[in-house]
Amino acid sequence: MSEHYPTLAQTALVAAAFKILLFPAYKSTDFEVHRNWLAITNSLPLEKWYVEKTSEWTLDYPPFFAYFEWILAHVARLVDPLMVKVYNLDYDSWQTVYFQRTSVIVTELVLVWALQTFIETAPLKSRRAAQTVALSIILSPGLLIIDHIHFQYNGFMYGILVMSLVLARQNSELLSSGLIFAALLCFKHIYLYLAPAYFVYLLRAYCLSSKSIFRIRFLNSIKLGLGIGAIFGAAFGPFAAMDQIPQLLSRLFPFSRGLCHAYWAPNVWALYSFADRILIHVAPRLGWAVNKSALQSVTRGLVGDTAFAVLPEISPRTCFVLTLFFQVVPLIKLFFQPTWETFIGAVTLCGYSSFLFGWHVHEKAILLVIIPFSLIALRDRRHLGAFRPLVVAGYVSLFPLLFTPAEFPIKTIYTIVWLVVFLLAFGRLAPASNKPRIFLLDRFSTLYIAISIPLILYCSLLHHLIFGKAYEFIPLMFTSSYTAIGVVGSWVGYMVVYFTA
């Protein structure tokens, strides 16, 4: 290990100390969501967990996460008994705040463990690069903003994902990798978007013979099938016994939401929505029809309120077909070339597809792309060229989550320092590729990062100084649309890299 880098444990310890200082910071409604889930799982019997609706923040994660909240609730009630009362809505005593913030830091140790495993199992010549990647993830601005200020438990669950991905590097651990991922699906169903890559990789590398795709390894297939069945049985079995599966699924998959969230996630539909806003002013001059009712909604993506004034409406089916198509394309290569690097690339592209074309995507889901991609970003300079605009766009797109003045210097300074330190380090560590570099991608990456600096300055500071509270949607629209260009450009660039590697 290079003496120039602190160890992962040392870094995690310093990061935890910094996160403790953020305990009094802004917290979103997600804080009350998780407090309410503590109360539901502590105060009510199992059969009422997915029925209870005293609060609007009903339990809508899979059963393993509910069991996780149940375990936390046993400690929470010792810290502050009022914290775990269902009727005690919007309760946020200092004991509650400190307990919930601490639980995020402690459970993030799963991510530290997974990243340490990633370092230790990396080839010796790649150990220094693996160390740098691990540090970049544990210090991720995304996790700091989403988990430790806004409030969620992504570090814990991405730790499970990273462990599964790392174990997949060893043929002897493929079964463990698949079972850990199955357990992850029972914690949070958003990871279903990555499941196609797992299915193809485990089918090809574990269930079929390496010599012939027509020879099935029956024992491996049985072990994998029984293991996954046991995990899903442990998660959903009790609710199936109570005939609550339809109710549970209605909580997990609510389809009444609109195409875009209130703040457009930086994906294809953000660009589509932006184009529609521009066409509202152009269409009358061209003689195009304008949907007058859609003009009533300046911010799109409110529940059940996604309407376009000029462009055609987008249906959930359209989103599903596009997502599936752009996932299947890289899976074809994975099936015929089932290496670990190709697998991580396919997982990354599945994350891209679901984020770019999915229905009602949240900006926080960008971590589905960034974290898997990080594991292979230093494979060579071509990979890094596609990765750079992704992290710039992805992390900047999270800024609107923290809209209070006190958090402005934290999110901007921390993110900019992270980008400068790690993108410079990555540039020094990424080896040259044996394939020619993509000129347009290199220029796009450099130009995109350069333009992002004044954009951040305007959207985060100058707009408010110039216009005050007027035109508040403009910086959000600019941020969403510009970061969408970065994510889409990164995706196109990585698709080229993936298929020519």
Curated annotation (Swiss-Prot):
The record places the following residue ranges in the Cytoplasmic compartment, namely: 26-103, 150-179, 243-252, 341-355, 405, 468-472
Question: What catalytic activity does the UniProt entry give for this protein?
Answer: an alpha-D-Glc-(1->3)-alpha-D-Man-(1->2)-alpha-D-Man-(1->2)-alpha-D-Man-(1->3)-[alpha-D-Man-(1->2)-alpha-D-Man-(1->3)-[alpha-D-Man-(1->2)-alpha-D-Man-(1->6)]-alpha-D-Man-(1->6)]-beta-D-Man-(1->4)-beta-D-GlcNAc-(1->4)-alpha-D-GlcNAc-diphospho-di-trans,poly-cis-dolichol + a di-trans,poly-cis-dolichyl beta-D-glucosyl phosphate = an alpha-D-Glc-(1->3)-alpha-D-Glc-(1->3)-alpha-D-Man-(1->2)-alpha-D-Man-(1->2)-alpha-D-Man-(1->3)-[alpha-D-Man-(1->2)-alpha-D-Man-(1->3)-[alpha-D-Man-(1->2)-alpha-D-Man-(1->6)]-alpha-D-Man-(1->6)]-beta-D-Man-(1->4)-beta-D-GlcNAc-(1->4)-alpha-D-GlcNAc-diphospho-di-trans,poly-cis-dolichol + a di-trans,poly-cis-dolichyl phosphate + H(+)
UniProt topology in membrane:
Multi-pass membrane protein
UniProt superkingdom: Eukaryota
Q: Name one GO molecular function term.
A: dolichyl pyrophosphate Glc1Man9GlcNAc2 alpha-1,3-glucosyltransferase activity
- State the family it belongs to: Belongs to the ALG6/ALG8 glucosyltransferase family.
Q: Which residues lie on this side of the membrane: Lumenal?
A: 1-4, 125-128, 201-221, 276-319, 377-383, 427-446, 494-501
GO CC terms, sorted: endoplasmic reticulum membrane
State the InterPro entries in the record: Glyco_trans_ALG6/ALG8
Pathway(s): Protein modification; protein glycosylation
Q: What protein name is recorded for this chain?
A: Dolichyl pyrophosphate Glc1Man9GlcNAc2 alpha-1,3-glucosyltransferase
Q: Which organism is it from?
A: Gibberella zeae (strain ATCC MYA-4620 / CBS 123657 / FGSC 9075 / NRRL 31084 / PH-1)
Q: Indicate the transmembrane segments per the record.
A: 5-25, 104-124, 129-149, 180-200, 222-242, 253-275, 320-340, 356-376, 384-404, 406-426, 447-467, 473-493
Going by the record, the broad EC class of this enzyme is transferase
Principal localisation: endoplasmic reticulum
